[in-house]
Amino acid sequence: MKIFLIFITSVLLSFNSFANTKISFALDWKFEGPSAPYFYAIDKGHFGEENLEVEISAGKGSLDAIPKVATGAFPIGFADINSLIKFLDQNPGAPVMAVMMVYDKPPFAIAGRKSLGVTTPSDLEGKILGAPPPDGAWAQFPPFASANNINVDNI
């Protein structure tokens, strides 16, 4: 995580650092555990030591954070790489790119109750699954279903 904070600091330092530079950082989701390092850096004064005044804004999903950066409303943001790929597919030439991978193995999961008979991927057939439409992990479900011989028409 220390390397990640150093990286974010170096990106933020690319902005003029002679006076306190105000910069907005768009999160992909609400203030939760994964965003703790950013707040830690603020609380410990790491950004301030570099003359940066960082404001962190909560998001509503990766497909909320990415357009904020692409339109210039925010100079930097945090988002799921799968959502960025989807965004760039729908918006070719958009001026946004990934500069660092934070999670090389994201913790995507399907949670099911054993008491309801969900113990293997194929047990999902006949069940109802829910995910928000812009969810980057949900985009992974079709290949997951295919790899596990799940008939998505039965879900």
What residues fall within each predicted segment?
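Sec/Tat signal peptide C-region and signal peptidase I cleavage site
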Residues: 15-19
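Bacterial N-terminal signal peptides
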Residues: 5-14
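Short, glycine-/small- and polar/acidic-enriched structural segments
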Residues: 22-155
